């Protein structure tokens, strides 16, 4: 029974981390992942740095840039720049939604303006094959008095059967004193519910990401006041949330944009491997990897054997089927690059 218990736990973890449609298999079959897709942006020195870049990996550790290192998607809407892209596989298993911050610091580096008078909208693309994408759309989600809508992410809520979309905003009601995490609900990423405050802390908070391990949700958030990443857990998306004791990275400073993904499911005699990546913005070093074999312990060690073709900035990772991996590789392999869609 022990191998079966481990296998069932492994299946639950993989399904919960955006693989549900990917891994509809019999319980007698060990789940397999055909590869991983990383969506990111490059920086803010040039307007084209703040667009959407793709990278592929077979093992979730060693990454290869697609499209000859050029952007795959470009936004000419709103502020004509996109940051912090988040890619989600929909529950139907056929649709992908890519949501991003509407912001270009390369065009305007005024921090006060970006916080007090920036975009209230998200830039959204959708696709059914990760190669052919819709035209981008700009959708206002933040409250009318918001000064920005940063680092959006989304997760399917099994209790309400819709998507919880969340982001960081400041608001005029407190003179833009601090960021809070706001949220709204949607079923189609076209129409959204009225926004509401999802995370309220004494300090400013940004860059929330949520991972499910098959038992509990784990929520990483950047405390913008002390410049540290925090970790909480909960049995449900709407809480209650409690801090994970002994989080080993709690004393790190200068990191943001946390993303956590399952590199390898557990198997008999071998624990799962999770990767937490943190954007080391303070040193302009891009993402730094850390690994854990049990999110509940809060223990992470520096990741070894990871390679990146350039400094990946705040982005996201999804697992792929073998067919999806091959399709992306064929469409954007060296010498077969495509003009960016917009």
Question: How does the language model describe each region?
Answer:
Residues 25-342:
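Carbohydrate-active catalytic/glycan-binding domains of CAZyme proteins
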